[in-house]
Regions:
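Conserved beta-strand-loop-beta-strand element in the redox core of flavoprotein oxidoreductases
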Residues: 3, 7-32, 38
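Conserved beta-strand segments of alpha/beta enzyme cores
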Residues: 9, 59, 147-150
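Flexible, acidic loop-helix segments that line cofactor/substrate-binding pockets
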Residues: 113-129
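Internal hydrophobic alpha-helix adjacent to the cofactor/substrate pocket in enzyme cavities
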Residues: 94-117, 146-148, 206-212
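A short, glycine/Asx- and small/polar-enriched loop/turn
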Residues: 18-19, 76, 167-170
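FAD-site-proximal beta/loop scaffold in flavoenzymes
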Residues: 33-109, 201
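Flexible, glycine-rich terminal cap/loop adjacent to redox cofactors
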Residues: 125-136, 141-249
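N-terminal glycine-rich dinucleotide-binding loop that anchors FAD/FMN and/or NAD(P) in oxidoreductases
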Residues: 1, 5-7, 135-139
């Protein structure tokens, strides 16, 4: 609950604030400071309790009241769920739309195609956008092990940043790959102008099994933002500085 934009705010429930993965709980405490911008990212919760799905025998996960299903079918054969109410599925409108269409096709049109919840692209539409598809570096390390990964990354200067002195570390990209050839791409991350437009195209490539060998052999369209993915060569393992020269874009 915001008491004042430039004053104090009260955290009525629970909030984690920590620079490391170990969260620190703050409950019912007051923090005071002055802010230029206040972002309320409170998320959502499933309304399965309000809709009384338990009366139909549908089981939900106690911790978040969501339904666990890989094919939208609940534990009750004739009850289905799509969208944000599903446990550990992307909370995105296009995901719910696609899953609903495929479910309707299976129920009424003899369709067989299941919703693919892997490698769903998404973008955070902040003033400098962040777009991604596939695994994060942390999740890839958890699944594959750090020694089995190669992380390519680079800062870059968009053509839109025509002022030479502008900070070259505002825009960044990362490609998470398997280390063994042909280095299958597991995730792509992009911070910069029009990130959503850039990632949308690469999302299809990732779903088709894009490899880094294919990526680096692709001729980029110059000058575009998307071509930066075809130019990245520096790995985190190398320890080299991924910052471009001040004269380069």
């Amino acid at each position: 609950m915001l008491a004042a934009i430039s004053g104090s705010y009260v955290i009525p429930a629970m909030y984690s604030l920590s620079p490391n993965p170990h969260s620190t709980p703050f409950q019912d405490k007051v923090f005071e400071d002055t802010y230029d911008t206040v972002l309320m990212a409170i998320g959502r919760r499933a309304l399965t309790e309000e809709t009384a799905v338990s009366n139909a025998g549908v089981k939900v996960i106690p911790e978040n009241a969501k339904i666990d299903s890989d094919n939208e079918q609940t534990n009750i054969p004739n009850v289905f769920a799509v969208g944000d109410v599903l446990h550990e599925k992307p909370e995105l409108t296009p995901v719910a739309v696609q899953a609903g269409k495929l479910l309707a096709a299976r129920l009424y049109g003899n369709g067989t195609t299941q919703m693919d919840y892997q490698n769903v692209a998404t973008t955070v539409f902040t003033p400098l956008e962040y777009g991604c598809v596939g695994l994060s570096e942390e999740k890839a390390e958890e699944l594959y092990g750090a020694d089995n990964l190669e992380i390519y990354h680079a800062y870059y200067k968009p053509t839109e940043f025509f002022i030479p002195q502008r900070n070259p570390q505002r825009c960044y990209l990362k490609v998470v790959c398997e280390r063994a050839a042909p280095q299958k791409v597991l995730g792509m991350h992009f911070i910069g102008p029009n990130a959503g437009e850039v990632i949308q195209g690469y999302a299809a490539a990732v779903k088709c099994g894009l490899t880094f060998e294919t990526l680096e052999s692709t001729v980029g369209i110059h000058p575009t933002l998307a071509e930066e993915f075809t130019r990245v060569t520096i790995t985190k393992r190398s320890g080299e500085d991924p910052t471009p020269q001040s004269c380069c874009s």
